């Protein structure tokens, strides 16, 4: 049993909760997720099973797309709807579509962002949420992120009321805190704000419409069709350039054999396959020997090579 499961993560569960539940359903210990989603967030959560856990790091660096909702009028401790109210300021004027689109445009491109106190970012060996739960606030490292697209989904021309909400879609780099973006939007518009709803609609090439629920996974287990829920390792890595080696080279892959970059591939990672179209390893460019590739992750062992 191996491959990537595209889970439609339900609301109220942490990513670790999802891994724990899937281990029980599949009766498989080797399971790991490819990036944390907050409990209140739903949507695409790729989970690696069996030998696929070896490729998890290559799936976490992908860009992510979200659709969500910002509410102006009050902020919270967690920057989302689950936290306690910190500041309230009624929206005492009409907010125009042009203003909202201007705020989104100002946050598009390469920007700096400070992670929220309620996050898993580590400072001095402790996670920020541990400080937050103890009532402490510490200096947080600013990180550089990229917002590839940030668009308003509502078709209204004006927004008004003591609190107002509007929907957005954002495509961003790994490590972006979308709830912090919601706070930053409020700052641009002059009001406290928080993220009132969020769903991840894409993680790299993986889309929400291709995800399955826990109920569907359990149904496949009961029907004996569990293999149908997996995306193969080969398919999950299909975005990387591919090299094919002969049988003799394949046997040496497991020992860390260097390969010549005969195809002059410039992409950072290259998948190496045998003639049976089985992915053996992921290679990268050798930092000291131009034109050579070195293994970054070997996916097969001695026994598997003999099959």
UniProtKB/Swiss-Prot annotation:
EC number(s) stated in the UniProt entry for this protein: 5.4.99.25
A Gene Ontology biological process term: tRNA pseudouridine synthesis
Signal peptide: none
Domain of life: Bacteria
Keyword Isomerase in annotation: yes
This protein's UniProt keywords: Isomerase, tRNA processing
Family matches, as SUPFAM superfamilies: Pseudouridine synthase (SSF55120)
Catalytic activity: uridine(55) in tRNA = pseudouridine(55) in tRNA
InterPro entries in alphabetical order: PsdUridine_synth_cat_dom_sf, PsdUridine_synth_N, tRNA_psdUridine_synth_TruB, TruB_C
Similarity remark: Belongs to the pseudouridine synthase TruB family. Type 1 subfamily.
Stated name of the protein: tRNA pseudouridine synthase B
Gene: truB
